[in-house]
Regions:
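Short, conserved beta-strand element in jelly-roll/cupin
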Residues: 4, 15-31
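Tight coil/turn sites that cap or link beta-strands
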Residues: 7-8, 45, 53
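A short beta-strand-loop-beta hairpin characteristic of the jelly-roll/cupin
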Residues: 24-44
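A short glycine-rich, His/Asp/Glu-containing loop-to-beta-strand
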Residues: 1-7
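A short hydrophobic beta-strand segment most commonly corresponding to one strand
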Residues: 21-24, 47-49, 63-72
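Short beta-strand His + acidic residue motifs that chelate non-heme Fe in jelly-roll/DSBH
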Residues: 12-14, 31-33, 50-62
Length: 72
């Protein structure tokens, strides 16, 4: 699935089950993911394995969209 976070967008802290792969298709320096209290700024083109059973959230304080391809 594609996950888009528009400028000013917030994905409030929540927990899911299992792990997911995030492929970063579009981002900016002000798009931040917080996982278990630690802030991350995933790099464009990066591929990340996330344990989504941990508390996580995202915020896009930038001026461009943040788009991830998420593989369940």
């Amino acid at each position: 699935m594609y996950v888009k976070l528009c400028p000013g967008g917030v994905m409030h802290e929540h927990q899911d089950s299992g792990k997911r792969i995030h492929i970063i298709l579009k981002t900016n320096p002000d798009a931040v993911m917080t996982i278990d209290g630690i802030e991350y700024r995933p790099e464009l083109g990066g591929i990340y394995l996330m344990d989504v059973s941990l508390p996580h959230s995202s915020v896009n304080n930038g001026t461009t969209d943040r788009i991830h391809l998420v593989l369940l």
